[in-house]
């Protein structure tokens, strides 16, 4: 994945841009939700999913409050706060507990009463292979 060509998706509703690998496929039904997109790669039992979406902030949470709330909801084991954004990562959990071998990485960017979110879900054994995507998410600027 290190050398693959990256494509850009520009959201028509919110005008943000997401970069994704050329061999990922866009899920067409992801376009039905305003401000959302989903790209995925599936081979044998390996699935890597990159998503972006916009979420309202009805409680007007400040960055620290939102980071604490989402970290708790997602069972994040790592948190990092930046200027106008925060990043969470950890193992993916279902209602029944931790999913074996699956991880997530997510960046939340605050803009007024909205959260712009980009996530990556991947098998733990693919951590090195998805480093470039994690770097893309780290560098993601909404505008």
Where do the protein language model's features map onto the residues?
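Signature of long, low-cysteine stretches enriched in small and polar/charged residues
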Residues: 63-121
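Hydrophobic beta-strand residues in large extracellular and virion-surface proteins
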Residues: 9, 18, 39-41, 49-54, ...
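Short, hydrophobic/aromatic-rich segments at coil-to-beta transitions
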Residues: 2-8, 36-38, 81-91
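Residues that act as N-cap/strand-start positions at coil-to-secondary-structure junctions
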Residues: 3, 12, 33-35, 72-73, ...
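Short amphipathic alpha-helical segments
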Residues: 58-66, 129-132
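Secretory pathway targeting signatures of secreted, lumenal, and periplasmic proteins
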Residues: 12-62, 93-97
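Surface-exposed amphipathic alpha-helical segments
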Residues: 22-26, 115-143
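Sec/Tat-exported extracytoplasmic proteins
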Residues: 28, 71-74, 141
